[in-house]
Design a protein with these regions (language model features):
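Metal-dependent phosphoesterase core characteristic of DEDDh/y 3'-5' exonuclease domains
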Residues: 1-121
Length: 121
């Protein structure tokens, strides 16, 4: 059995904290670690981290909040901050990021991503 990979917007700083607390109280808990046993403990997809990487050098992006990303990506703000709508919007943002990545990654290669071709350490 492979544990599901959790995905969310600011999942590491918010959602997983709550998941861990609720699992400690109600279960399931990993007997060895005492941590939640619902999701993968290794892999997580924090959409906000991905947004930061894609937008850090864009002067037009003033904030990476969910509200700002809804506006930037043309998503409706109707029902914003409703839990289910936030999940749907997060999924749509992740899908847009993945499609953008796929489109870009077919045109460039990592070894040519640096200005002079050298890798920095």
């Amino acid at each position: 059995w492979y544990a599901p990979i959790p995905a969310g917007y600011n999942i590491i700083g918010f959602d997983m904290v709550i998941v861990n607390r609720m699992c400690k109280e109600y279960g399931p808990v990993d007997k060895k670690t005492g941590l939640q046993a619902l999701f993968s403990k290794v892999y997580k997809i924090d959409v906000m981290d991905n947004i930061f990487m894609w937008t850090e050098n864009d002067p037009d992006i003033k904030s990476i909040s969910m509200d700002s990303m809804r506006e930037v990506m043309g998503l409706s703000s109707d029902n914003a901050h409703d839990a289910l709508q936030d999940v749907k919007d997060t999924a749509n943002i992740l899908i847009k990021l993945m499609k953008t990545y796929r489109a870009v990654s077919t045109k460039i290669k990592l070894e040519k991503a640096f200005s002079n071709g050298d890798l920095y350490v």
